[in-house]
Amino acid sequence: MLQTSVRKPINVVVWGENRHEQTDPSIAARYPDGMHGAIKQGIEEYLGGGASVSTVTLDDPEHGLTEELLAATDVLLWWGHAAHEEVDDEVVERVHRHVLAGLGLIVLHSGHFSKIFKKLMGTSCSLRWRGETDRELVWTIDPTHPITTGVPHPLIIDSQEMYGEFFDIPAPDELVFISSFGGGEVFRSGCTWKRGHGRIFFFSPGDQEYPVYFQPAIRRVIANAVEWAVTSRPERTSPQLSRVYSGEFFPEFDPDGNAIKGTVAI
């Protein structure tokens, strides 16, 4: 009899800065459950029981990103804007360590300037922007990429902030989307990288002044990215510097990641 395995739900955490929603009545009205809440709803809408989604915010203890929570999380989504510098460096180091060990990370919109994204990219992550209502066309560059499944070409956002080049990021492993704007600007709006064992996706649409995260196609991109960002490994460990010996292949390792002499000799 054929044995079928049931895939466990993806454990997803949406991290939201949640400052605009508390200080700007128009944004609070636009996102009554917070921007993080709208992002969570979109993932649940498209992935259903395939994902278990929770939210944490900047003002939670340890910004909600405890060691225990990160260890149990498959994919972390990050939206921040006005309070990047309030994120504790110890928490940034913790998230960084988990990404290198296999945590998937999806960075949204102005999260490009977050401490964690800049640390993982190793660049300033600066860009050009125009805070006026513009029309954004999100063009699919790689129609075979799983993040683009079911996404219209182009994806049209009628009202959005402009992001433009030069975007100071390392060359993406994969360029998934490019956006164009009414002023003639273009922007690398969907990019992937691997860092250590972790997968990273940056997706630029999502300014707080517009209801972008309620748009079905945007929700589809984010849900697709959640599925893509999952890594399947027996345990979450970071890559290690490891000494090996002549005549040995796939040796056993000690707790520090060093090969144990005399194991699995060939």
Regions found by a protein language model. Give the residues of each.
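Short glycine-rich His-centered loop
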Residues: K8-R30
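Cell-envelope and extracellular/periplasmic
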Residues: E17, G80-H81, G206, V230
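A short acidic/glycine-rich loop-to-helix N-cap element
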Residues: T23-D24, E209-A217
